[in-house]
Amino acid sequence: MSSAAMSKYVNDMWPGSPQEKASPSTSGSGRSSRLSSRSRSRSSSRSSRRDSRSSSRSSSRSHSRPRRSRRSRSRSRRRHQRKYRRYSRSYSRSRSRSRSHRYHRDSRYERPRRYYKSPSPYRSRSRSRSRGRSQHRWSYYAITRGRRYYGFGRTVYPEDRPRWRERSRTRSRSRSRTPFRLSEKDRMELLEIAKANAAKALGTANFDLPASLRAKEASQGTAVSSSGPKVEHSEKQTEDATKNTSEKSSTQRNIAFSSNNSVAKPLQKTTKAAVEEKSSGSPKIDKKKSPYGLWIPV
């Protein structure tokens, strides 16, 4: 390959060569052909991209448009109905049902139906919401109210008295601040018992008592001596009252009813009629005088 041909090849490949400047027509036509081919390829690629985008958009719109329209229509209908059905029964019922359903579904507000254990009476009330302690808590409340739940159902069986209440009552009695006081009779009985025990232990019935016990014995003797005549007088009065009642019961009169008078009046019997009744044992009834006959007291 000669040097002249080599230089021509290099000049043709190099853009800023003097040979290219000398022949501008040939270089301009080559550039224009290259630019036109590039622009055509770019425009074809852009058009293909646009076509693909438009086709994808149209397909997505065709699938998504009816869904959006349905949603928008349903929302508009709901809003329109809520405006006019705010105070209607059906709307309020649906809301109340949903709320009640949620309320019953929530595990916080449900009471356990089974109670396997009852807590100790001195256990503090726990506010925790764990399962184990909640059972103890509800059963503790049931015991304090005097009721207890059994089995699966909600049947309530009342109890007479819980155990912890009885314990607290007995303790409160033992811890009472007021001292226990004996009456005079109890004291004298205890004194007599003490005398008998002392006589058995010492073997002699004659022994000296302290001054405080002597004063009590003297006061008891005077009370017995003063109460003696009063008791006798009261016994006499009771005997007189019993005698008077027996005499009145023996002198009772028979009552008869007549057709003329509706008011009961006592009959005054003669001595002959009384003697005849005693002899016969049963009184004679005059049917002519009274249609009902004679009433006999039983």
Swiss-Prot record:
BP GO annotations: spliceosomal complex assembly
PTM remark: Phosphorylated. Phosphorylation at Ser-118 and Ser-120 mediates the interaction with spliceosome proteins.
Feature: compositional bias, Low complexity: 23-36
A Pfam short name: RSRP
Record's compositionally biased regions (Basic and acidic residues): 230-246, 274-289
Any single Gene Ontology cellular-component annotation: nucleus
Region (Disordered): 1-135, 161-181, 218-298
Location in or out of the cell: Nucleus
Top-level lineage group: Eukaryota
Compositional bias per record (Basic residues), positions renumbered to this chain: 60-105, 124-135
Biological function: Probably acts as a spliceosomal factor that contributes to spliceosome assembly and regulates the isoform switching of proteins such as PARP6.
Protein name stated in the entry: Arginine/serine-rich protein 1
Native source organism of the sequence: Mus musculus (Mouse)
Lineage: Eukaryota, Metazoa, Chordata, Craniata, Vertebrata
Gene this chain is encoded by: Rsrp1
